[in-house]
Swiss-Prot record:
Assigned EC number: 1.3.7.5
A Pfam entry, by short name: Fe_bilin_red
Gene Ontology MF annotations: cobalt ion binding; phycocyanobilin:ferredoxin oxidoreductase activity
Keywords for this protein: Oxidoreductase
GO terms for biological process, alphabetical: phytochromobilin biosynthetic process
The organism of origin for this protein: Synechocystis sp. (strain ATCC 27184 / PCC 6803 / Kazusa)
Chemical reaction(s) catalysed: (2R,3Z)-phycocyanobilin + 4 oxidized [2Fe-2S]-[ferredoxin] = biliverdin IXalpha + 4 reduced [2Fe-2S]-[ferredoxin] + 4 H(+)
Stated family: Belongs to the HY2 family.
Transmembrane segments: none
Gene name tied to this protein: pcyA
Keyword Transferase among UniProt keywords: no
Protein name: Phycocyanobilin:ferredoxin oxidoreductase
Gene3D superfamilies (UniProt xref): 3.40.1500.20
InterPro entries, sorted: Ferredoxin-dep_bilin_Rdtase (IPR009249), Ferredoxin_bilin_OxRdtase (IPR022870)
Annotated function: Catalyzes the four-electron reduction of biliverdin IX-alpha (2-electron reduction at both the A and D rings); the reaction proceeds via an isolatable 2-electron intermediate, 181,182-dihydrobiliverdin.
Amino acid sequence: MAVTDLSLTNSSLMPTLNPMIQQLALAIAASWQSLPLKPYQLPEDLGYVEGRLEGEKLVIENRCYQTPQFRKMHLELAKVGKGLDILHCVMFPEPLYGLPLFGCDIVAGPGGVSAAIADLSPTQSDRQLPAAYQKSLAELGQPEFEQQRELPPWGEIFSEYCLFIRPSNVTEEERFVQRVVDFLQIHCHQSIVAEPLSEAQTLEHRQGQIHYCQQQQKNDKTRRVLEKAFGEAWAERYMSQVLFDVIQ
C-alpha cells in the first residue's frame, strides 16, 4: 500500500519541539512526499516509546518508509522532559543503486540548538561520493557557520561535505535547514535516475553501508541515554534494529 500522506499533524511531539526541529521535520517529510513511499514495518513495540530518564519523561516517535531505491527511510523525533529535543533521520539505500546515505541529527535544549549535523555519506570502497553528487554539491558552495563542531573518532564515515555545527543565531539555523533541503533535493533526484549496478558493485556498496552502521553504533552518547532510560538490552536492540540495523 502506497503512502500518500506524510503529514506530521498527528504527532503529539511536534508542537512541543524546538522550532528548528519542527522546520526540519516538515522539510524532510515534504521531500519524501515526492517518492513512491510504502510503509516500513518496525518492531511493534518500538514505533512509539515512553520511558523515564533521570526523573524526566522520555518520548520517542518513529516513522519509517521504503521505496525501490531506499530500503529504509527513518525519521525519529524525541523529547526528554522540557530540557532536550532530538531529531534523527537516516535514508538507508538499497545497495543495488549505489547511493550514499543521507543522515541528519539535531539536538536542542533550553539554550537552543547545541548540535546540528547533516551529510551524504559515501558507501563506495574509496570513500568518495558518486561523481553526480560531487558535481551538484560543489555547485552549492560551502555555507558559512561561526561554530564548527568536531566530528567523533568514528567520523571517517562522513563525506567532505558534512556539516557539523552549533548554530549561532536564527539565520544560521535557517541556513542549515536550507542546506539539508539541498541535500535532499539532490539525493531524491539521483535516486530516481539511478540505474542498477553489477553484482560486484552492489556488494561493494553493501559493505560500505554495513561499515557505516557499525561505526554509528559506536555512538556512546546515544547508547548511554538509551541505557539509562531502558537498560542495556533494550538500548542494544534499539540501536541495532531501529537506528542502525545492519543490512543482511
